[in-house]
Amino acid sequence: MQQRFKNWLFEGAYTPDGLTFDVGNATREALTRGHGLSDEYSNGNGSLMRILPLAFTEAGPSDVEAVSSITHAHATSVEACQLYVDIARRLLKGQQLSEILSGLETSKTYARLQTLAELTEDDIRSSGYVVDTLEAALWCLLTSTSYPETILKAVNLGDDTDTVAAVAGGLAGIIYGLEGIPDNWLAQLRHKELLESCLF
């Protein structure tokens, strides 16, 4: 799998136009070195933004850790990925996000997830730090009632908007389904046919 990530980074594999862009420092350095970075300052959101597909497999926590650790091997990044996959699976079973979060077992680093419903937009940070990204994405989802509202709220937070929207959008897709995504948004997807051939 690591080799496929290198093919993506260095050869543009799996991209619509054969080009990669906006690659995080930790991701680039980890793939160049050949192993994930495990220091405290390598907790960007690079592994979180790509981990959702594991929610649709039988991957356990150690598998999620292994996939995150291709680029982001620190415990903070790994926990974010494990929490996200767990939340996604619970949503797939029909559980409500508010109930999931209130009963979530986390380290102190992610303790605010249990009280996200009490926070205002001013309390939310949407930086590239993995803790901020997960909190912001879940807050947007928790305080919205539709797919478009979730995404627009994430984008309007500022900072690392594309990743926060991607992380929030993955879970919003589970909740609202394909029919919840505006047709004009779907129509603008580049290489939509390729995506559809993979999904349907």
Label the predicted regions.
Residues 1-200:
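Structured, active/binding-site neighborhoods that engage oxygen-rich ligands
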